[in-house]
Amino acid sequence: MIVLVTCLLLLCSYHTVLSTTNNECIQVNVTQLAGNENLIRDFLFSNFKEEGSVVVGGYYPTEVWYNCSRTARTTAFQYFNNIHAFYFVMEAMENSTGNARGKPLLFHVHGEPVSVIISAYRDDVQQRPLLKHGLVCITKNRHINYEQFTSNQWNSTCTGADRKIPFSVIPTDNGTKIYGLEWNDDFVTAYISGRSYHLNINTNWFNNVTLLYSRSSTATWEYSAAYAYQGVSNFTYYKLNNTNGLKTYELCEDYEHCTGYATNVFAPTSGGYIPDGFSFNNWFLLTNSSTFVSGRFVTNQPLLINCLWPVPSFGVAAQEFCFEGAQFSQCNGVSLNNTVDVIRFNLNFTADVQSGMGATVFSLNTTGGVILEISCYSDTVSESSSYSYGEIPFGITDGPRYCYVLYNGTALKYLGTLPPSVKEIAISKWGHFYINGYNFFSTFPIGCISFNLTTGVSGAFWTIAYTSYTEALVQVENTAIKNVTYCNSHINNIKCSQLTANLNNGFYPVASSEVGFVNKSVVLLPSFFTYTAVNITIDLGMKLSGYGQPIASTLSNITLPMQDNNTDVYCIRSNQFSVYVHSTCKSSLWDNIFNQDCTDVLEATAVIKTGTCPFSFDKLNNYLTFNKFCLSLSPVGANCKFDVAARTRTNEQVVRSLYVIYEEGDNIVGVPSDNSGLHDLSVLHLDSCTDYNIYGRTGVGIIRRTNSTLLSGLYYTSLSGDLLGFKNVSDGVIYSVTPCDVSAQAAVIDGAIVGAMTSINSELLGLTHWTTTPNFYYYSIYNYTSERTRGTAIDSNDVDCEPVITYSNIGVCKNGALVFINVTHSDGDVQPISTGNVTIPTNFTISVQVEYMQVYTTPVSIDCARYVCNGNPRCNKLLTQYVSACQTIEQALAMGARLENMEVDSMLFVSENALKLASVEAFNSTENLDPIYKEWPSIGGSWLGGLKDILPSHNSKRKYGSAIEDLLFDKVVTSGLGTVDEDYKRCTGGYDIADLVCAQYYNGIMVLPGVANADKMTMYTASLAGGITLGALGGGAVAIPFAVAVQARLNYVALQTDVLNKNQQILANAFNQAIGNITQAFGKVNDAIHQTSQGLATVAKALAKVQDVVNTQGQALSHLTVQLQNNFQAISSSISDIYNRLDELSADAQVDRLITGRLTALNAFVSQTLTRQAEVRASRQLAKDKVNECVRSQSQRFGFCGNGTHLFSLANAAPNGMIFFHTVLLPTAYETVTAWSGICASDGDRTFGLVVKDVQLTLFRNLDDKFYLTPRTMYQPRVATSSDFVQIEGCDVLFVNATVIDLPSIIPDYIDINQTVQDILENYRPNWTVPEFTLDIFNATYLNLTGEIDDLEFRSEKLHNTTVELAILIDNINNTLVNLEWLNRIETYVKWPWYVWLLIGLVVVFCIPLLLFCCFSTGCCGCIGCLGSCCHSICSRRQFENYEPIEKVHVH
């Protein structure tokens, strides 16, 4: 029956309802609804599933439930104040036919800076189908639009993927589950879907809640609603009991008792583990040395609970607790039958002294039946002290208490002062007595403990825990245990190795597992063995001191076997030996005569301690080898000594020394037993983890038989000194030695292991499904069972999921599936950004410069524990004392790799078309060309590979003469004068007789062709002969034709010589000009080859940088590996060898040196790696800038894209980065000008300035006092125009005088780097120095480009030498300039014949008188005319009037 109350006065006073009407909130009794009877019980037992009784406390839903809903379709708000938890029940009052489905309920728990929102739905809601109808959202937003949040704004409101927790709301939960949120200063607990989630949220809670609710359902009864809820402000306790499946609970009302019970009592879970959430009140970390104050570390502690006995109070009667045969009849919860190592008494006293007076508080029944009593006194006691007032007060003491160990009422040893407050006493079966975690006293092993006690206060509370040692991650605060994580599972082992109880999503190295007890394998050389048993007898002398304490006498005797009548020195003369110690104990009362047996407190045994030797005495029989080994009672010639001590029930006392003389070697072996004779004492345990000693090399590993054959060597080690294999000399079989544990990386998501990467194909971490990748095997919870994936390399398309964690290019999804994520595909063809013609100035040269930029580094994961300890369990325990050293190293590398992976993934993408052009064959194909280039046969043939096309073709056409003509005729080639020969041939018509008739004239000189055939020669010879013969008779004229012809031909030759001289001059001038051009051309070739040489040198430098980048990491890893050979001042670099030679305590000290040294080496490596990653991060950003500015566009910055004016750049992939080919213009000539920043002009009273508008132009003043503008990129001066300037107000230049302190106010981002570094060095100057390790060769793949770089440098040098040779050749060419010795031109004037001169004389005689007569006789001015005129004028003066007037006549 539902109780309906409509009055708002029933609402609790701790909350206030706003924006509601009086009928919208009612009080309901949820537990009375059908099916809700066990609502509270199920909620309380949701986190307590074990057998037993506990008291739990918290802000539980024990207050009034309310339901607020409205009939209107709009939503309303209600506010709760001063509460610490808020709970609600879904559809507690709705039947299955109601329509409240889809109606949201949302409440907001306010805090600063983080708050929490929980929203819930009945069915799938629009845009939230994947959230399973409910969501816990952690947000930093203070102001939330609740209306939008309920629909589609949740994704931007919740901060991060790990800040959203979806949960399920199903119809079967109809009112049967409580949902809610409880918060405090430490953590937040979310109760959803029958589970509780502990969220570590650091915030300041305001303890108020805003509730949003909507309209009610349309059920048949009134006021039915979809939700009931309550806010809780009171802390309550419940006592829960689970016995044989019967669960009962009751409200615990005795606050003091309930508080003590809840704080100190718990029910161990299955396996004896302390449950999560236990407060560990007054539980301390047990230690035999210094006490940890605070921290988190892995340790071996008695925290495995065999039985927990809650004891409200003790009676007066004594209680006895035994380690063996303990009866666990009163255990709370589960009980185990494990061996009890430590009994822990946890004391819950707060104020008064609780111990009863006069009681012997603790009695320890040690071996041999001797009972030691421990008691404390308020002052010092004497030998005859009465122990009637001795006590150990529990709780806070009222003064100092001095504690002693007593035997039969006599104080044997003073222990020390009791702590002011005793909270816990723990006693181990090995005789250790701890108070508040500190080892207060140690004695012989203990069988039982007894004491009597009266609590005295009703509120006192005890728990007695029978515990066993187990490995756990313990968090200590103020010396008290606060939290424990057991290293009992695969995921917990990783938590322990990472020193954290909460693992973030990521990859973690798998922790080494404990090897435990394994078989012993020994490999020795076959030999004939002789054996010696060395029996050492030690006779101890014991007596009591004046205070009754046992004292070992220095007169104790050591007896060695007699050898050569000498008992002071004994040397091993066989090749095998065993050492045995026999101890006797005699006592004396007062004198030094020891003739009585040692009993009771005088009982003592002799032990031989390590002393100064690099090996322990008890390890001598553990196959230690020597070349020489002697024991001596005298220090003379000794190398080291053992300390011989007497061990009593209270202490150890050194009485003598046993000296050792030894030499290292393999001739003598210490063995456990006699094996004399001819034997091969080798014992092998194959294919299983074994503790081995192979030819003196010790360790733990798996020995396997191999098929290898090696001719030399007995055993084979790595660079780090680890044993890799060995040879059995009897049969030559090679065996390999591998570690028992192989390093692996586990993928952890949401606190669970979902996968693991390993180098061997073997199941691990409980993972059975596997697949392979090119580099490792991957085991996962994902079911790789199909034929397509199991055992084969995976593909990124095999699994369709979103990776949660990534490492390099590997991603792991939440279901454990492995995907590769580093390839991002882009669509579209490869197209040029722009095209155009570039005009290169004559004072520039084109250069291609190569630049390499590193983009990423290969991620490195180091298993710190494996590197430092190599799986040695004792070393691993020592390593935990270094707290978070390994975790810091591994997380630094992992976080660096993840950050780099994210940046590289966001930077790089892959284009399919670009990949097609990556090969030469595809690049030289027209299939990938734009259509405008289709006419070319190939890209390479047209542009890049076309040298063959510009060479002469082998089938080019040439013209040749007729071979028949050359064979049948003699060819005479002469030089002719102009057209003389052609005109001569045309005139003669082939007749020799016409030779003189057809003589030609060249420049007025008669000439004949110089060649005469046989007929002409016969004709002229006959003429000459006839002339000679008939000369006397007057017939010499017959020789005239011959003379004329000869003279004409001589004229021809003379004129021909003149023409040849002119031609030679023309040829010489042309040749000299050609030689000048050749010299200039060779000079340009020389410059080109010089540029090519520089280009090759640049490429060589870039390749050297690539090689350095690739090899740097390998060299660093090599450096790290080599450090494993360094013993760091320990006796050996092998941890197994150290523990094999020394006792545990001495070995720990030696191994601690190795741990410190190796951690230092790891820190140096990590620092180097992180520094390198920081450099690469900057280089990656610079490469991105260069791609954007150089490749995708043209840079305007000089020197950014190559050292010059940038034209274009090409980028190509290179190992770990990119290589850029920058095409730039390099200036070859410079013009120096004086640049002006502006012009200051005056106009009367006004002064103004003019500055150049375009900052890429430079204003300068030339020698002619004129101003010019020129671009900065090339000298092209031009006259400035008014449009090139902009006017400014004035010409004043403002200078700011500021100090370094004032610079940040002027330049906000200014940082004084030098001062910052100096401050860091001063404030954080370390008091130690990191050793400088040398780099050695590491067994890794190196990028060896040395040969290629040397070849490039050789070619560059060869080209340089070629330029030198060309310079010499140019000088030689200049020396071949033609300087011809010109032929003298002789000009001969031919005299005219006599008859010519006769004719000239006759003409002069007859013509000159006639001309003179005409000149003097004619005209008005003639002589005759003048005489006639004179005569006439005398006769008559008017004669001239008879003449007609003269008129001017123009003749055209």
From Swiss-Prot:
Listed CDD domains: TGEV-like_Spike_SD1-2_S1-S2_S2
Record field: transmembrane: 1394-1413
Annotated region described as Interaction with host ANPEP, given as residue ranges: 660-804
KW Cell membrane (keyword) present: no
Domain of life, source organism: Viruses
Annotated stretches, region: Fusion peptide: 1025-1046
InterPro entries on file: ALPHA_CORONA_SPIKE, CoV_S1_C, S2_sf_CoV, Spike_S1_CoV, Spike_S2_CoV, Spike_S2_CoV_C, Spike_S2_CoV_HR1, Spike_S2_CoV_HR2
Family that this chain belongs to: Belongs to the alphacoronaviruses spike protein family.
Function in brief: S1 region attaches the virion to the cell membrane by interacting with host ANPEP/aminopeptidase N, initiating the infection. Binding to the receptor probably induces conformational changes in the S glycoprotein unmasking the fusion peptide of S2 region and activating membranes fusion. S2 region belongs to the class I viral fusion protein. Under the current model, the protein has at least 3 conformational states: pre-fusion native state, pre-hairpin intermediate state, and post-fusion hairpin state.
Name the record gives this protein: Spike glycoprotein
